[in-house]
Amino acid sequence: METIAIRNIVELVSINKKAKEHLAKIKSEFVLTFEELYILVYVYKGERDCYNVKDIVKQSKFKPYYISKAIQSLKDKGLIAKKRNEKDERTVAIQVSKAQHKKIKNLLMDIEAEIL
C-alpha cells in the first residue's frame, strides 16, 4: 500500500476520524473487518492467482493470527481459496480464481460507490 503524507496533527486527527467512520460503515454494511478489506485490496492490486500468506503478514504488519482469521472468513465467503504447500505443510497460500477476482473487484467497487 502506498504511503500518504500527513502535514500536521490536525490533518492526522481528521483523516483518522473519517477513516474510522468509513471502516465502521464497511463493517456494518458489507460485513468485512479491516484485515479482510486489506487482504481483498492486496489481492485486487496484485492481480495474481496465488499469494503467500507470509508475504501478506510481512507487508501488512498485522499479527499472523488476525490474517489467518481474516483469510478463513474470506474463504467462508467464497472470495478466496486456501492451499498448503505440498513440500512444506506449514506454508499456506491464497488462491484466487478469475471468477473470485471478478467478485472481489465488484465488491470493492460497491464499497467505493457506497463510501466515497
Protein language model annotation of sequence segments:
Residues 21-63:
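N-terminal helix-turn-helix DNA-binding core of bacterial DNA-binding proteins
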Residues 1-4, 10, 34, 64, ...:
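Surface-exposed, interaction-prone regions with an acidic/low-complexity signature
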Residues 1-5, 50-51, 63-64, 95-99, ...:
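General structural signal for secondary-structure boundaries
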Residues 72-116:
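Charged, amphipathic alpha-helical coiled-coil/dimerization segments
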